[in-house]
């Protein structure tokens, strides 16, 4: 095992890890922070105290549990609204929403997950609780499959061998050979789809956005409800639409 770099500030590393451990949790106790991060209670207490005093965590005086503050959320929005990709994408997402009347998302990769960073939804929409910032495994969403379709064969094989295929719904694809076939199909068609694989009743299609240098940056994702949309109809109508949207955003980066 390599020695940590002399440039690494281990206390800062612990603090950032503790902040990341709030993903998926409304609040955490010191014991939970320690367990989530493999650190002692004393270390968790020092980190939590520092984050509280700097305004990134709030400590409930009654329960003694900690939760993230708006200041912490603001870091994410600073990233979001300073990136040219996101500045250019919103108008395109809005146009696509007007054309199809459905939810349109922008997602970017983070390891083996996709993070939803922007959304335009119709006024009638009553959403599942899937706020901007939510991470979804690449294998369970069209956005991730569209991006994985661009991976070199060896890297795709490695990821598929190592991926954890949880059964989120009765329709989630967990068979590696079937996943590979769906990704191959996405490579051929230039868009991917996922049919009720993370949420029951949700069908989504996605196409990749590219930067100036040709590198993939993320994906446009259109999410529609079943049974109002069948897979055949979504592929026929939304496949070409999501490809056009991704190309429009790519040209402006």
Identify what each model region corresponds to.
Residues 88-96, 160-207, 252:
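Short, basic/aromatic recognition patches
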Residues 2, 200, 217-253:
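Juxtadomain coupling helices with adjacent low-complexity linkers
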Residues 63, 67-163:
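Amphipathic alpha-helical effector-binding/dimerization core
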Residues 1-87, 94, 247, 251-252:
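N-terminal helix-turn-helix
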Residues 209-212:
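Sensor-regulatory modules in signal-transduction proteins
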Residues 23, 144, 148, 152, ...:
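Short amphipathic alpha-helical signal-transduction/dimerization elements
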């Amino acid at each position: 095992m390599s020695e940590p770099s002399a440039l690494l500030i281990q206390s800062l590393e612990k603090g950032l890890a503790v902040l990341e451990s709030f993903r998926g949790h409304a609040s955490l106790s010191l014991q939970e922070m320690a367990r989530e991060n493999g650190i002692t209670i004393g270390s968790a207490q020092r980190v939590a105290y520092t984050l509280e005093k700097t305004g990134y965590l709030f400590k409930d005086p009654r329960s003694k549990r900690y939760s993230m503050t708006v200041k912490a959320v603001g870091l994410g929005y600073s990233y979001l609204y300073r990136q040219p990709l996101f500045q250019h994408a919103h108008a395109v997402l809005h146009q696509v929403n007007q054309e199809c009347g459905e939810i349109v998302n922008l997602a970017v990769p983070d390891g083996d997950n996709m993070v939803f960073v922007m959304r335009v939804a119709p006024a009638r929409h009553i959403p599942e609780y899937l706020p901007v910032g939510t991470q979804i495994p690449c294998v369970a969403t069209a956005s991730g499959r569209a991006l994985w379709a661009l991976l070199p064969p060896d890297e795709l094989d490695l990821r598929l061998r190592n991926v954890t295929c949880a059964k989120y719904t009765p329709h989630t694809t967990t068979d590696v050979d079937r996943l590979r076939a769906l990704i191959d199909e996405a490579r051929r068609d230039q868009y991917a789809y996922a049919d009720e694989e993370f949420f029951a009743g949700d069908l989504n299609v996605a196409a990749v956005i590219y930067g100036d240098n040709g590198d993939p940056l993320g994906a446009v994702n259109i999410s529609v409800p079943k049974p109002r949309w069948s897979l055949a109809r979504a592929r026929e109508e939304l496949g070409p639409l999501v490809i056009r949207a991704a190309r429009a955003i790519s040209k402006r980066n």
